[in-house]
Regions:
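Flexible, acidic loop-helix segments that line cofactor/substrate-binding pockets
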Residues: 20-34
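Long, well-ordered, tryptophan-enriched scaffold segments
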Residues: 1-21
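C-terminal non-catalytic regions of proteins with extracellular/luminal or membrane-system context
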Residues: 1, 13, 32, 36-203
């Protein structure tokens, strides 16, 4: 018991000594500067996997449809112990709006592992029909990957693949932007999209 008390007291002493250093009440930093570093890192980490017919870069006057909830609710971190609370976060749709780019948006699916929502799917297909270019934000929702379990497949959720095929039946000018923290199969995009951009977790 005495040895246990000594060991425990050592931990208590360490906590007391470091408590002030761990306080963030008086901690200040340049949020915008840090955000710019993260922004630049995100840009430089993307990998262009496919670009048939030079579909990228998108022409300035192109009519753009953006499909996929990831465009509005981006994944910027992994699951489990890596969770953080960001000081600033900007979605793809936020960025387009800030630059004055007008796009048609439809979420197409929900960020969970539930079956497809046919109403969302139909809305997305209709949104994509008359666009010059369709940017489809697909990938792995947080529920599909984490440090606490193994994945059983390399595929993105079936409802997203179904949506991609449905949109491709109406519009062939598709660029898939992938959002994932671990490897995924690009086979669905390879057959149904002219462009594939691997963006990982842009945090």
């Amino acid at each position: 018991p005495e040895q246990l008390d000594r060991m425990a007291q050592g931990m208590v002493d360490l906590v007391n000594k470091t408590r002030s250093a761990m306080s963030i009440d008086d901690y200040h930093f340049d949020v915008d500067a840090h955000d710019e570093v993260a922004h630049q890192a995100a840009i430089e980490s993307m990998v262009l996997l496919k670009n048939d017919d030079d579909i990228l870069p998108v022409a300035a006057n192109a009519k753009i449809a953006v499909i996929g909830e990831f465009a509005r609710t981006p994944r910027y971190q992994g699951g489990g112990s890596s969770h953080i609370t960001p000081t600033k976060m900007t979605s793809f749709l936020d960025t387009l709006a800030a630059r004055g780019v007008d796009v048609a948006f439809a979420p197409g699916f929900t960020l969970d592992l539930e079956p497809a929502d046919r109403t969302l799917e139909a809305e997305a297909v209709e949104t994509a029909k008359n666009a010059d270019v369709v940017l489809m934000f697909l990938g792995l929702p947080e529920a599909a990957e984490s440090e606490g379990f193994d994945r059983e497949t390399l595929d993105i959720p079936a409802k997203q693949v179904e949506l991609l095929k449905a949109v491709a039946a109406e519009n062939k000018n598709i660029v898939v932007v992938l959002s994932n923290g671990s490897v995924v199969s690009v086979a669905p995009g390879a057959g149904n999209a002219k462009g594939i951009l691997e963006s990982w977790l842009l945090g």
